[in-house]
A protein has these predicted regions:
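Conserved "HGTGT" condensation-loop signature of ketosynthase/thiolase-family condensing enzymes
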Residues: 1-182
């Protein structure tokens, strides 16, 4: 496996290909600013939950490093890991079904599965390969590498967007994604 590109996003730092990108915002506002300045052409972004926004933005920056950008393919996997799954959205959804008012929100419920973010990225880029989201007890580079290596055992898989995508709430998050080739 060969790493072709790397992106790191935290509430106050964005690193793409080893270069720090400067933005005025932080936290949730940072993701919106990056979207407006670097992506800006995917209206579904504003319907996404914080985890999906983080993964979407990180993948867009990561794929911006690829020349030419690869789309409409069956040989690219999307494999993410975190420790809290979609717990932030689960808590938001729980608020809509509390005893004080039973008004479940379908808009929030849609994002109560962490693998929604892998689907959003696959749909955006027309990737038809494996999409997986693994929940680990903690960030474990060795385990993540082993799982990605297993994905490459599929003879169809030639590349992957893979890495850590943790979002405990809209202000606290970490993305460390890699573009990897076989």
């Amino acid at each position: 496996m060969k790493v072709k590109a790397r992106v790191v996003i935290t509430p106050d730092k964005v690193v793409v290909g080893g270069k720090i990108l400067i933005f005025e915002s932080s936290g949730a506002d940072l993701l919106v600013e990056i979207y407006k300045k670097k992506v800006g052409n995917y209206p579904k972004f504003f319907k996404m939950d914080p985890l999906a926004r983080l993964g979407f933005i990180a993948s867009e920056l990561l794929l911006g490093e690829e020349t030419p950008r690869k789309t409409d393919c069956e040989d690219r996997a999307v494999i993410f890991f975190n420790r809290s799954a979609s717990l932030a959205d689960d808590a938001e959804y729980q608020k809509t079904i509390g005893k004080d008012g039973f008004f479940p929100s379908p808009a929030v419920f849609v994002y109560t599965l962490p693998n929604i973010v892998t689907g959003e990225i696959a749909i955006r880029n027309k990737y038809y390969g494996e999409t997986s989201f693994y929940v680990l007890e903690e960030k474990d580079d060795k385990v993540m590498k082993e799982i990605v290596e297993q994905a490459f055992q599929d003879p169809v898989t030639e590349s992957a967007i893979a890495g850590w995508l943790e979002c405990s709430d809209s202000e606290h998050f970490e993305a460390e994604l890699y573009l990897i080739e076989k």
